[in-house]
Amino acid sequence: MNSNEIENFIYLNNTLLSEVPEPNSVFYTPKCFSNSKLPHQSDLEEPSSACSLSKNTIIDGGADEPYDSSDSCATFEFADFFKDNLDDFALDGPIININHVNQTSPYTHHNAEPLHDLQTFSSNLNHSNNRRQTICNFNMANDASKENETPYMVLNNKFNPVLTTEYTQQHLVQCKMVLENHITSRFPHFYTKLPDVSLVPNNMPHYPDEVTAKSAPKDDFYVPRFTRGHGISKLGLCPICSHQGEFIWLRTKTSAYWYHMNFVHGIHSKGRPYQPPIEFRTVRLRKTRNAIGVPNKKYMIEGKCHQCNKWIRCQGRKDVSVKIPEIFWWRHAHRCHIITTDLR
């Protein structure tokens, strides 16, 4: 190969790589979408004469030269190709993501659209052209009283979840199974409702010494709202017991008030209650040798901690009645749980 042939070859390659041809000059036939390639046709060969392009269109740049409309090859229509080759592909309108098909805002007073017309997407990829598939059925009236009602998940099958606000037998059975594992009646103080400690308790008795009222945040259940005395003899009124009809005064300079709030009510010194166990289980205790006095229990209830993810004993080993059965869990929570005052 002489120098002239090498220069022509380099010029031809640079022209083909540097210039981007027009779509109508490349996709001149639907056969171009076929992945099949003839064995006798190489990469550098020109297209067949049956449907060829002008030399100026490819070699001299393509984009710079005008396209010859009198050519035997007609302009390829992309819309016709996609309609014929893609199943259920919508060309009209904007591009739609399969994960966000026909999303609408929920029912509000400003946008009075009923919830039962809410549309969502199906988990089946082979969806049909019918876009109004209702997978979430909201059977509720369009009134303000039920606007914020939380729907319940009912799994009819694993491929068709249905959201509804009506209780069904299957939902009640599932709730019963969950309550048996996560809530127990043996520890009632875990689930008692705390009073509004910012209010003055009813029928508060009068005391000979001066009672000082102290302001504190509404969501702080630890700080006493009323105190008596000064110095080491300073007493604080338990804010929770006072709303339950019991006026218990405890020393604040010693650990009496702190011990009462932590291990009687389960309130941390930062003002937040301790988190109860996220799950319960019953385990069998091993027999101990040389047991003296009260016999040990045969079974033990354990609770799972959300912080350390461990099973903690919620009862004592001895088979005796305890005045505050939650004290065993609150002792662990005081050492393990991270209490924060940020509610955001």
Swiss-Prot record:
Keywords assigned by UniProt, alphabetized: Meiosis, Nucleus
Record-linked Pfam families: Rua1_C
Signal sequence interval, chain numbering: none
InterPro entries the record matches: Rua1_C
Compartments in which it is found: Nucleus
GO biological process: meiotic cell cycle
An annotated GO cellular component: nucleus
Name this polypeptide is given: Meiotic expression up-regulated protein 26
Chain's gene name: meu26
